[in-house]
């Protein structure tokens, strides 16, 4: 039997909070890299340096873990948006959340059912509702604005090439997308 060096043992998470945090981090990284379907519970356990039984103990099924990762990313993004975090940190968090969402959706996971909380969407709805005569109008406006943002985040390289706007800088494109989102969120 081989024993692990002491340095490896020190890096292993201990205690409920550390173990849960390590599992969430590992699952988030792996889901962003390759998607939930291509990631096994054993992969997550190995990356987080815990026994795979602990993944089940802390999070239940893989579907529940996907939901926990999405909730974790939403909460983390909300905290960043309310902090003094630099724009590049927020941008990386948005990108990571978008990647996990896209991969989970493409893998066939029912993201809208697995994720329990949508704090950023709730805040946006609260801000937009007073501008609309109906709740449905506000909800549709927010859905359209999010779809536009997700579309650009995921398909920007293809959209730039297909429409001949490769020469726009990232900042110019971001301003244009933000202007379009603002128009969507304002009733006509």
Swiss-Prot record:
Keywords of this entry: DNA-binding, Repressor, Transcription, Transcription regulation
Kindly list the GO molecular function terms attached to this UniProt entry.
Answer: DNA-binding transcription factor activity; transcription cis-regulatory region binding
Question: One short Pfam family name for this protein?
Answer: TetR_N
Q: Does the keyword Transcription regulation apply?
A: yes
Gene3D superfamilies linked to this entry: Tetracycline Repressor, domain 2
User: SUPFAM superfamilies, from UniProt?
Assistant: Homeodomain-like (SSF46689)
Q: What induces it?
A: Negatively autoregulated.
- PROSITE patterns linked: HTH_TETR_1 (PS01081), HTH_TETR_2 (PS50977)
Q: Where is the HTH tetR-type domain?
A: 17-77
Residue range(s) of DNA binding per entry: 40-59
What the protein does comes down to: Negatively regulates the expression of sulfate ester dioxygenase Rv3406 and its own expression. Binds specifically to the inverted repeat sequence of the intergenic region between Rv3405c and Rv3406.
The domain comment in this protein's record states: Contains an N-terminal DNA-binding domain and a C-terminal ligand binding pocket.
Name of the featured protein: HTH-type transcriptional repressor Rv3405c
Q: What is the lineage of its organism?
A: Bacteria, Bacillati, Actinomycetota, Actinomycetes, Mycobacteriales
């Amino acid at each position: 039997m081989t024993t692990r060096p002491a340095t490896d043992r020190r890096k292993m998470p201990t205690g409920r909070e550390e173990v849960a945090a390590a599992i969430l981090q590992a699952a988030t990284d792996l889901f962003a890299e390759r998607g939930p379907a291509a990631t096994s519970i054993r992969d997550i356990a190995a990356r987080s340096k815990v026994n795979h039984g602990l993944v089940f103990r802390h999070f239940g099924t893989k579907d529940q873990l996907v939901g926990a990762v999405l909730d974790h990313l939403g909460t983390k993004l909300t905290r960043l948006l309310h902090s003094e975090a630099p724009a590049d940190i927020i941008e990386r968090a948005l990108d990571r959340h978008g990647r996990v969402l896209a991969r989970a959706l493409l893998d066939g996971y029912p993201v809208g059912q697995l994720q329990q909380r949508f704090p950023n969407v709730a805040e946006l709805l609260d801000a937009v509702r007073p501008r609309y005569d109906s709740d449905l109008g506000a909800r549709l406006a927010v859905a359209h604005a999010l779809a536009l943002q997700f579309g650009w985040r995921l398909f920007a390289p293809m959209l730039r090439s297909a429409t001949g706007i490769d020469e726009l800088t990232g900042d110019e494109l971001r301003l244009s997308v933000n202007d379009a989102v603002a128009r969507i969120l304002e009733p006509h």
